[in-house]
């Protein structure tokens, strides 16, 4: 009951667009000056929604089928940035004169292969995740593809290491394109920052839940490579 002697108020804030999805739609909103940032909480910060608050507690439910009621504390989240690599080649008839073309799809394949081999050099203490996917690939079986757009996130628990990896991936992309005589257009987009939880505040949460026998278990200090705009 100690909290009853404190002078405080409690507010609940619900923010949209936590997941970093529907990016083309959000970019159009940004171009039309409807938003400034692509994520919900950064936009809320810009709008001053959190100005009246001294600190925040984020609560996130998890999936799965737990065998007992539990909570989790001090689960750090990764941050991420987003990369776009548009590999440019030269079209040609795949049957009549394939030698006259430069295969952008082959360049992207070389990039993915090099990225897989580079994985051995990544420092795992930062819990890095990289997941390249094809975003745009206008292709036909009788034409050497001249344009492939790859998108990937770079997740890590360190902003500095994310930026270092970004430069390494740029080099891999540029060298892959150069090796086959093509070119690459590179775009970098910042996503969310890592979320490093306050162990000091978590102590109060832990002590509070000790008063609730319904909570049988408290999991702690299990960082993950997932990200969230709470960072």
How would you describe each model-predicted region?
Residues 6-129, 138-142, 227-230:
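Histidine/acidic-residue-rich, glycine-tolerant segments that coordinate divalent metal ions
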Residues 106-231:
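Metal-dependent amide/peptide-bond hydrolase catalytic core
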Residues 1:
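Di-metal (Zn2+ and/or Mg2+/Mn2+) metal-binding site signature of metallo-dependent hydrolases
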């Amino acid at each position: 009951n100690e909290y009853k002697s404190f002078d405080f108020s409690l507010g609940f804030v619900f923010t949209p667009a936590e997941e970093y999805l529907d990016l083309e739609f959000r970019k159009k909103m940004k171009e039309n000056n409807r938003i400034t940032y692509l994520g919900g909480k950064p936009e809320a910060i810009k709008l001053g929604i959190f100005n009246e608050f001294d600190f925040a507690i984020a609560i996130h439910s998890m999936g799965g089928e737990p065998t007992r009621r539990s909570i989790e504390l001090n689960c750090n989240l990764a941050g991420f940035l987003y990369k776009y690599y548009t590999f440019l080649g030269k079209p040609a008839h795949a049957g009549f004169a394939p030698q006259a073309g430069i295969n952008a799809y082959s360049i992207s394949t070389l990039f993915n292969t090099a990225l897989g081999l580079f994985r051995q050099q990544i420092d795992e203490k930062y819990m890095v995740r990289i997941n390249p996917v094809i975003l745009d690939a206008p292709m036909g079986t009788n034409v050497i593809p001249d344009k492939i757009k790859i998108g990937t996130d770079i997740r890590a628990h360190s902003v500095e290491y994310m930026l270092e990896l970004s430069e390494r991936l740029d080099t891999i992309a540029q060298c892959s394109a150069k090796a086959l005589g093509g070119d690459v257009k590179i775009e970098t987009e910042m996503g969310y920052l890592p979320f490093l939880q306050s162990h000091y505040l978590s102590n109060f949460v832990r002590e509070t839940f000790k008063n609730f026998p319904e909570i049988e278990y408290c999991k702690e200090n299990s960082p993950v490579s997932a990200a969230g705009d709470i960072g």
